[in-house]
Amino acid sequence: MAQTTLSHPTAPVSLEAAPALPTKRDALLSLGARCSLPVILLLAVGFVAPLIAIFAYSFAKPRTFEVFRSFTLVNYAEIFNGSNTVWLSFLWSLGFAFATCALLAVIAYPIAYGLNRVFGKWSSLVSILFVFPLFVSENVRLYGWVLFFIKNGVLDGTLKMLGFEGGPQILFQPPMILAGMLYVYLPFMLFPMTLGLAMVPRDLIDAARDLGANRWQIWREVEVPLAMPGILIGMLLTFVLGIGAVAEAKILGGQSVIVISHDIEIAFTYSQNWPLGSALAVVVTIFIGALTLAVFSRLDLDRLLGRR
């Protein structure tokens, strides 16, 4: 009996090699990596290198420039000395920064809400009005405040000319410093907050309203949580700028308040004590860096940048 064999068709075998997996070298030579090289170089030269230099100087002997010939903790010991007034300056800076954040959050929120929901076609014009002062030097704007509020200045002279006793003497006092910081840093709180509110879908607000939520519940449970990334970024920017503010304290406050940035400036210039100034800068940088990491750990940057 003849045996029959069944032959099964076989698929043609491709002789082409499978595409190789991308290697680290390919990743380094990718278009995105090449395009980011100028930014990386700029950050390395303009940001990382100065930080390393400041950190190295903080361990040098006081009033010397011998960075690599000596190592001492005297500068940090002087900072953490209980009798050092630098902590009072640091507390003033913290107080101004926190007060600026809190007040600007209250001031900027209605404006940001108006830019998103109320102003309509006028939103661009209103935004330009807030951006335009940034094209003028901060010192010029603050000296304009001095000319306006100083004794026999614009306000005081005008009131006397009209027969009144004159304007209030509010210049060179802490409240005036805070007012100047509110004026200068308002855009840095406003625009991130506007971006955060723009991320709130109108459908969710309409759905919450249809389900019986009142205006307070919608604001508390829908708008604020979804807009929180933009609000936190605005508060972080304002706080970092506020804790490093020196022009407002010097121009609007005179010598009534000494902030930490002023102490650092004096150490580097008048006292010529670069190691102490570097140690102060390192302490402030570590504090701001820790705060920044804490804030960014609560942010969804992918959602904020529109990636998902």
Please identify what each model-predicted range represents.
Residues T64-S70, L147, V246-W274, R308:
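Glycine-rich helix-loop "coupling/hinge" segments at transmembrane-helix boundaries
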Residues E165, A213-R215:
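Short coil/turn motifs that cap or connect alpha-helices
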Residues P19-A33:
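Cytosolic juxtamembrane amphipathic/interface segments immediately preceding
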Residues L31-T64, I79-A198, V222-V246, G253, ...:
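Membrane-water interface segments at the C-terminal ends of transmembrane alpha-helices
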Residues F71-N81:
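A short amphipathic helical element positioned immediately N-terminal to and/or at the very start
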Residues A2-E16, T194-I205, R209, S278-R308:
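C-terminal transmembrane helix and the adjacent membrane-cytosol boundary/short C-terminal tail
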Residues L211-G212, P225:
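Glycine/proline-centered hinge or cleavage motifs at structural transition points of membrane proteins
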Residues R69-T72, N152, G196-D206, R215-Q217, ...:
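Transmembrane helix boundary and interhelical loop/hinge segments in multi-pass membrane proteins
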